[in-house]
Each structure stands twice: as structure tokens, then as C-alpha cells.
Amino acid sequence: MELQTLQEALKVEIQVHQKLVAQMKQDPQNADLKKQLHELQAKITALSEKQKRVVEQLRKNLIVKQEQPDKFQIQPLSQSENKLQTAQQQPLQPLQQQQPQQPQQQQQQQQQHAQQSAAAPPSLTASQKTVTTASMITTKTLPLVLKAATATMPASVVGQRPTIAMVTAINSQKAVLSTDVQNTPVNLQTSSKVTGPGAEAVQIVAKNTVTLQVQATPPQPIKVPQFIPPPRLTPRPNFLPQVRPKPVAQNNIPIAPAPPPMLAAPQLIQRPVMLTKFTPTTLPTSQNSIHPVRVVNGQTATIAKTFPMAQLTSIVIATPGTRLAGPQTVQLSKPSLEKQTVKSHPEAEEKQAESRTVTPPAAPKPKREENPQKLAFMVSLGLVTHDHLEEIQSKRQERKRRTTANPVYSGAVFEPERKKSAVTYLNSTMHPGTRKRGRPPKYNAVLGFGALTPTSPPSSHPDSPENEKTETTFTFPAPVQPVSLPSPTSTDGDIHEDFCSVCRKSGQLLMCDTCSRVYHLDCLEPPLKTIPKGMWICPRCQDQMLKKEEAIPWPGTLAIVHSYIAYKAAKEEEKQKLLKWSSDLKQEREQLEQKVKELSSSISKCMEMKSSILARQKEMRSSLDKVKRLIRLVHGVDLCRPVDSEATAGALSNGPDCTPPANAASTPAPSPSSQSCTANCNQGEETK
């Protein structure tokens, strides 16, 4: 019963494991799922260990009961193989749909397994190792009724082809079984021993899938999803017996960037390139060495040959036909005063290439492996991989100062194109858009260190001193019209020449940013000691800009730079205007605030003055009232005084006895006006 409970627990854990594997396929980068998967694997491993111990205990109990008769008959090997083949054609049922077998049958299987292990001869068991299959796999996951084979199988059967491959191990490690082990049929109902020389003891426990494949029945393969953990947890096996992985494209070859369509299948047409006539005065060295360079299918072959001091004329003709099989060398004619034509043949030149000094190109640095479909897709979109980006960034340092001693100068494939001048389009004889930098491989040239004018044919100046040093003629087949050799400015990526515009020699040259001319630092007037930083314009372009005689064909990058400079200038001007406007507004605001302060102070002063004026007005009114009263008093005093004077005068005239006269009694009483005046005078005196 303990074995049955362990099997049920393993069944549940395996179902959960399969669900986790399905989730991991949808989201392989989820860390939580990985953690749960590792924990579940640890649980399954622990349960399998417990089951192993229970099986070993049952095996010991069965060994004690060896005297009991065997309840199952061992069938021959051929019958078991036939049953294996017929049973493997049936699909595997899910784990939850299979019926568990009885514990009595499991005990019988353990008993049978113990008897088989006891019946094995010592010669076989000493040299063979066992592969233990947990009984949970057989009783719960496989609906196959397969009989076990005898351990003492004949040796002739061992050499046959494998019949079964059995598969998933602990921690998702695949069990590697040799062909001899696979030849012996596996008893899938019992924990049997599969004997075979060279097979190591591996405990196979189903963690996520069980795969059975037979080569004889390929039409119905059994596909069960599998999950492969990270490489640090699963060491990759050296040999997988019946597992055939999906063929992977070979990507261990360094992948070069996809060439343009015109370079996909270059064909070398019969085209004599140039006839160069050298004199001893034009050769710089005393040995008169000529270094011709031939480019065939992207490989360079440099040949150095020494000639005596004599006038030399040679013609180099490419072989007619299609693409050449391998790199070929150029034959140089012997020194003579007559013209000699040399044709290169593949058979003869292969023998001569061994004796000549061929300088192969340097071995390319190993690049990162890339998918060719991915590269083609990126190239079609105009994208660049990391390796090509590093190449472009490293080659940007060579832009200002590069050596042109080697005429086969190849630049970056993905470098942005620049505009071509009208002269370049007129001199170009090839279809534009074939190469970025350097010379195309279909032109073969014998180049010397003499004065060579690449852009102008010699017939235009027959009497010039340069024509005496260099004579260049071109011969083409009959239907083709004779044209001039394409100048170094005929390529799209680099519109600059390869020779100094002053001395007509190669070397370390400084390129003008506005035209195709190049100069030595020493040939300039005044000569430069270091490379100038930023944009450099040659003297001729400076003169043209000053005179405004011709329109200079600006390259695209320079036009972008100038437009950006103009844009920045406009932005700066607008910024300055806005700053000035803001400063003016701030100043005006400050002035207004000052005016507000002044007005507020003046208003406060006015209010104070108003209050003071009102107070003074009140005081003045009170004082005016007092003055009016005083005036009234003064008027009242003046009215009372005449009456008193008359009375006193009458009294004096009457006599000293002051008796009034007789008619005094008859005088009327004083008028009320006089009485009022006296009253007022009395009041005025009282106020005083």
C-alpha cells in the first residue's frame, strides 16, 4: 500500500510538472516558473528515492520467498520484440485516463524480477550494469503489456539494430543507452534489469515525458512535449540513440555582409585594361620595381618583379569567359622596346603561381556567428550588426588621413553615401551603385609609381610634359567603343582621387570636404604639419567660393552639416531675440512696479495732506467764528457809546447840583434800541 500511495503522489506531481512545462514553453523567461519547476523536480526526486527504497525492501522480501513457483512464464526474445513493435504503434494515453493495476500484480512483478536477477549467470552480471526503471512509469503511464526477456540472451541477437529508445531521467537528463543495451527488450511492467555491456547504472524516472520510438514504424511517431532546463543543469549527452533533432543551419562560418545585387555573380569579361609606358625618369627607385595588383573574386595577388633600366611597355589582358576558378596572377612581359601582349591561361598560371611571390590577404578577425536570414533581413532594412558597427567606427578614424599605397582600398560597406558631382557622372562608365569604396574587382590594373593621370586621357594634351612620361591606351573588342578608364571618383562611397592634385603621387593624403581633390600635407601652400580639425577646404575650393565663378557640388553630408549650422544659427538668433525681449519685459515690469510704489506713496501723502488740511480747515472755521464774534462785539460797543456821551453832556449843562431841568421829567424814557445796545455792551464786557 505504501508503494501505491507513493505512485499516486508521483502521478500528481508529474501532472503538475507537465502543466508547468507547458507554461514554460509559453513564457520561458519567467523566473517564478523556473523556481517552481526546480522545487517540483526536487519533490519528484525525493518521491522516486522513497519509491526506490520501498522497491528494494519488496525485493528483499521476495528473495526470501524464492522457493515459491513462478507465476509468469518467460517468453522468448522474438515474441517480446514482436509485442514491442505492435504495442508501440498505439498512442500513449494520458496519465489520468489509465487504470492502476493491483498491488498483487506489482508484487508478482517484483518476484519475477528477483527471479530473473537470480537466474542470470555470473559471467554476464559481472560485466554488465543495470538500468532501473521505476515501476510507476510502467504501471501508470504505459498501457503496454510486455513480457520480459531472459537475461541469458544469445550473443547473436546483440548485434541487431536497436528496437526501443527509452528516455527521460531524473533532473531531465536523458538516459544514453548504447546499441547493445537497446537490442535487449525492456520489461516495462517490472523494475527489470536491462543487460548490456557498457551501459551505466541509471535510474530512469519520468519527469515530464516518456518517448518510445521504433525505426521500423516511422509513420506514427509519438510526440510528447519536453522541457529542457538551462545548460548549467543538464549536461548535453554525447550520443542520442533514437532522438533526431531538427537540422540546424551551419552558422559557424563567418558571415560577410550581403553584397549588392551587381556583385552577387561577378563575371570577368575580356577587357584589356591599360598600357603603361615607363621610362627610367618616372620610376622612383633605382631597381625600377613595378607592383601590379590583380583582384580576382575578392582576393588580391601582388607580384613584384625587377626590370633593368630600359623603356618598358606591357599590356595586361584578362581571360575571356565566366568566373575564374581561383586566384590568378598577372604575367609581365620581359623588358623590350616593342609592345608584347601576354594572355593569362588558367593552366599555365597555376604552375607559375607557385614560383611567384603571392601575398595573400591577412586572415580576417573571427566575427560573431549570425543567422544568414537575419543578416539578409537587416541588410534589406538598412540595419547594421554589432560587428559591422564596430568596423565602421574603427574606420571613421581613417577618413581624414588614409594611405593609398595599396590601390585595393576597401572601406565600410554600410558607410553612408555621399553625393556625386556632375564630373563624376560624366567620367563614370559603370552602372552606379555597385560598390562603396575601392576599385571593383572587374578592373585589372598595372600600377606603377610614375606620374599617372587617372581622370584625363593623354590624347587631350599631346605635347604636355606629363604625356612624355605616361602614355595610356585602351583596346576593347569590336562592338565596344573605346572609353577612358574609370577614374577613382567613379565609385559611390568615396568620391576622392587616389593621387595628390599637386605632385600626382600617392601616399598619405588629406581629402577636401567639398570636392574630390586630395593633397599631401607638404604640397600645400603653406604646408601643414598636422591634420586640421573639423571641415577642411582645399585652396581651389576657397578661390571658387571667393570668386563665385562656379557652383561647388556640395556633398550630402556637408549640405546636412550646413543646414544644421543654419538651423542652429536661426535657433540661436531666435533665442537671443527672446532673451532680449524677456529682459526688456523684466525691465519694464520693474519700472512699473517702481511707479506703483511711487504712486502708492504719493497717495498716502495726499491722504495725510487731506487729513491735515481738514484739521486746519476746522481750526480756521473756529478762529473765523471767534473773529466774527469779536467784530460783533466791536460793533455793539460803537453803537452804545454815542448815547452815553449825550447823556453825560446834558448832565453837565444842567448845573452842578445835577438836578434835572423842569422839562427833564417830561423827557421820554430811553428807546429800546439804546437799551439793547447797553445790554450788548454789558455782554461784551462780561465775555471779556
Swiss-Prot record:
Covalent link location (Glycyl lysine isopeptide (Lys-Gly) (interchain with G-Cter in SUMO2)): K65
Residues with the Phosphoserine modification: S456
Comp. bias intervals (Low complexity): 85-127, 660-679
BP terms from Gene Ontology: chromatin organization; negative regulation of transcription by RNA polymerase II; suckling behavior
Tissue: Expressed in the brain and testis. Weakly or not expressed in other tissues tested. Localized throughout the central nervous system (CNS) in brain, including the cerebellum, hippocampus, and cortex. Notably present in neuronal cells of granular cell layer and dentate gyrus in cerebellum and hippocampus, respectively. In the seminiferous tubules, the signals it is present strongly in spermatocytes, and weakly in spermatogonia and round spermatids. In some cases, it is also observed solely in spermatocytes (at protein level).
Region of interest called Disordered, as start-end residue ranges on this chain: 78-127, 327-373, 449-471, 650-688
Coiled coil start-end: 571-609
Chief place of localization: nucleus
Zn-finger segments (PHD-type): 497-544
Keywords assigned by UniProt, alphabetized: Chromatin regulator, Coiled coil, DNA-binding, Isopeptide bond, Metal-binding, Nucleus, Phosphoprotein, Repressor, Transcription, Transcription regulation, Ubl conjugation, Zinc, Zinc-finger
Molecular-function annotations in GO: chromatin binding; DNA binding; zinc ion binding
UniProt cross-references to Pfam families, sorted A to Z: PHD
Compartment(s) where it occurs, according to its Swiss-Prot or TrEMBL record: Nucleus
Extent of Basic and acidic residues compositional bias: 336-354
DNA-binding region: 434-446
Listed GO CC annotations: DNA repair complex; histone deacetylase complex; male germ cell nucleus; nucleus
SUPFAM superfamilies for this protein: FYVE/PHD zinc finger
Sites of Phosphothreonine modification: T453
Primary role: Component of the BHC complex, a corepressor complex that represses transcription of neuron-specific genes in non-neuronal cells. The BHC complex is recruited at RE1/NRSE sites by REST and acts by deacetylating and demethylating specific sites on histones, thereby acting as a chromatin modifier. In the BHC complex, it may act as a scaffold. Inhibits KDM1A-mediated demethylation of 'Lys-4' of histone H3 in vitro, suggesting a role in demethylation regulation.
Subunit (UniProt): Component of a BHC histone deacetylase complex that contains HDAC1, HDAC2, HMG20B/BRAF35, KDM1A, RCOR1/CoREST and PHF21A/BHC80. The BHC complex may also contain ZMYM2, ZNF217, ZMYM3, GSE1 and GTF2I. In the complex, it interacts directly with HDAC1, HDAC2, HMG20B/BRAF35, KDM1A and RCOR1/CoREST.
Identification of the protein by name: PHD finger protein 21A
Organism, as annotated: Mus musculus
